[in-house]
């Protein structure tokens, strides 16, 4: 009887392991998941970047559907009727089927127990989390890049994540924090704000872009820049609640970024300015576009929250 019980237990365990292996999504797969199921791999985001998007969506609601479609790898939104609902995909259409443009999709790593860890998309998904009519239960499609579910424990899992540079273990002051202090969910109430991360975002195409030569942009690229800039820029010198002060801060960040030689290291990131897409000359026209089209939304949304 004891032998039978032991054998049965082994069989059940083997079947459970096999079932988990079969159900665990593998690298390259595209899967649907609710935002609340995603575990962040960073404790901070740039709130101002998200404020810009939320302000834009409030003024032009159709832009939220563009965000949804593009993030699902479906191109822009196609037909968006007046009563379309982000939580009901059948109420509107996107240009292409899910996953047609995988390069635009957000990415996850599968961890122990099948938990999904978001590695790219914290800003886009927090924007949708905070968007009226979307929220934590909104379902989105993501792309699996790695399966680390066979890690024997969380300590090993996080070691693998750090080795692969798929986790950002710093707070909004640039201080190191342990994986256990990462938030369990997205959203403003769970994440910290890193203003420098936002300022770097607003220099995109003006001071940095996609790495050249076909190189793949490292995860957390803007955070590497922001963490270095923490030692270079005194944000206290700028009134970030006024458009003029915010523009001046963006320009100061942009000028400092382009001052780095292509081969120069960006702080202790382990990457050079070239590897992080750094430009050698400031693109004034792109900077002016940001000043005119993005900064006003940031300032207005900041005021609406006070």
Feature-to-residue mapping (PLM):
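A cross-kingdom marker for long, charged
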Residues: 245-306
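Boundary of Sec targeting at the N-terminus
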Residues: 20-22
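Short active-site loop/helix that positions an aromatic residue
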Residues: 122-136
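Charge-dense polyanion-binding interfaces
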Residues: 136-178
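Bacterial N-terminal signal peptides that target proteins for export
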Residues: 1-7
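N-terminal signal peptide c-region/cleavage motif recognized by signal peptidases
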Residues: 14-18
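Short alpha-helix boundary/capping and kink motifs at helix termini
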Residues: 24-115, 123
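Active-site-proximal loop/hinge segments that shape catalytic or ion-binding/gating pockets
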Residues: 164-265
């Amino acid at each position: 009887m004891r032998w039978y019980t032991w054998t049965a237990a082994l069989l059940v365990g083997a079947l459970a392991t096999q079932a988990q292996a079969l159900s665990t999504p593998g690298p390259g797969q595209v899967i649907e998941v609710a935002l609340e199921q995603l575990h962040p791999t960073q404790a901070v985001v740039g709130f101002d970047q998200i404020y810009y998007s939320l302000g834009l969506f409030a003024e032009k609601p159709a832009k939220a559907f563009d965000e949804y479609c593009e993030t699902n790898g479906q191109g822009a939104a196609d037909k968006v009727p007046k009563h379309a609902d982000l939580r009901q995909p059948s109420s509107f259409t996107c240009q292409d089927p899910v996953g047609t443009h995988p390069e635009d999709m957000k990415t996850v790593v599968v961890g122990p127990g099948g938990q999904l860890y978001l590695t790219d998309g914290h800003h886009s998904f927090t924007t949708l989390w905070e968007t009226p009519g979307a929220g934590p239960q909104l379902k989105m499609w993501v792309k699996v890049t790695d399966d680390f579910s066979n890690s024997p424990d969380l300590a090993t899992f996080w070691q693998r994540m750090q080795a692969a540079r798929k986790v950002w273990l710093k707070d909004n002051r640039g201080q190191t924090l342990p994986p256990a202090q990462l938030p369990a969910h997205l959203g403003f109430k769970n994440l910290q704000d890193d203003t420098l991360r936002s300022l770097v975002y607003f220099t995109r195409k003006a001071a940095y872009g996609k790495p050249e030569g076909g190189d793949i942009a490292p995860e957390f690229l803007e955070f590497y820049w922001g963490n270095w800039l923490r030692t270079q820029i005194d944000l206290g010198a700028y009134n970030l609640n006024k458009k003029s002060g915010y523009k001046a801060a963006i320009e100061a960040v942009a000028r400092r970024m382009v001052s780095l030689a292509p081969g120069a290291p960006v702080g202790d990131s382990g990457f050079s300015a070239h590897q992080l897409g750094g430009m050698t000359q400031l693109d004034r026209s792109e900077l002016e576009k940001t000043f005119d089209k993005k900064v006003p939304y940031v300032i207005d949304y900041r005021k609406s929250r006070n």
